[in-house]
């Protein structure tokens, strides 16, 4: 995040930063303005504006469309209970972080359990956080204390190398010290349901997060069903799982994934478009897709639409496809993994 002329804080294309920092800024004693790139200015911020206003915050979309740019006037906040209509760790974390500046306990209940990194982190640094079922609560007291934290490897970034190992014959890949938080390990469960060989070795706790080495080997895959409460645990990994499904035998159904339409791009539409361009048999649905796998895929020109997860997913697809694949705007991977292509090339040596 950086400052740009006109007193705006600029969050690039980072929806997590935009939503979480809004919760913190809402309880301060000063005013703030937030904006981001074209993708951020299309993503729905009404989902955080509503609960923050319920806490007494002054926050508005400057264009009146529920998206950034946002103006936030810091105010004293009230503790609330919020029933979130979406299972979103970004929404939950925004409200809980605002709750640190409220006058009473703040709690959030979700329709399905989303990733819980914020709750673990706050507790690790001395926060009074409770979690029961699909509800998380935070108290404004005691105040957080500083300390040393350790963060394991990101399973969302590891996912592309897990997939590459499954698709390239003869592969065996060991990824060390990867976070395996059970609210984030949906991709491992899906790979196993597809008969993929993935093993957890040297399990440990890194700071406040469970971690392990991941050993993955090439093997034949079959179709599976991905939906329900599993979706929040792998929402960012669905693009690479769709790629795996296209190479697997049988049919894979992805459902309950409408949230992909409001990410950096409409990922559902782009996945259907791109997989079809490579020769896959894919039918889009309102909240997912049906992938009839087992076809040989071929290279194609893939428009990433400036979406880092689309670019990385189809770089992996290209490894197992016949012919050459060109990815437009391939450098968009820098938003989350600047060294992705270097690391992928090293893996192939």
Question: What is the meaning of each model-derived region?
Answer:
Residues 1-349:
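Structural preference for solvent-exposed beta-strand-turn elements
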